[in-house]
Amino acid sequence: MSVVVGYLPTPEGQAALSAGLRAARDLTTTLVVVNVESARGVREAAANPGYLQALTGLLQESGVPHELLHPVGDFDSAEEILKAAEGHAGRLIVLGLRHRTPVGKLLLGSTSQRVLLEAECPVLAVKAGQA
């Protein structure tokens, strides 16, 4: 059993990670972090090269048993999150959602929407500053 977090080095990703750590601690289970940054392209990753080291350090300091997954190549973020939940007996998936404009609220991001619709376990959606 595990808690699965879809992670990006953004405020929303940090909120998801914080909520995921709390949930894993409360459920006394493993945290599986799916680092989907590479799906966004090399330019964004190059803008913050230290994020991976900071993420690894934060996970180690948390004391929560964890696994950090790094999908490679051309991949679909939602598919990788769903596969991680299935492969690690996910009890909960945690995603960070961006603030949306009134028109944008009619639509979720494609990754979030697909995970919400296809997940076999509960999905917790958090916003930056609310986790």
Where are the model-predicted features located?
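Conserved acidic residues
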Residues: 1, 91, 120
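Short secondary-structure boundary segments
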Residues: 35-36, 96-98, 127-128
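Charged helix-capping and loop-helix junction motifs
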Residues: 47-52, 83, 107-112
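Glycine-rich, Arg-bearing micro-motifs that act as flexible, cationic patches
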Residues: 95-114, 118
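Short, flexible loop segments at boundaries between secondary-structure elements
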Residues: 121-131
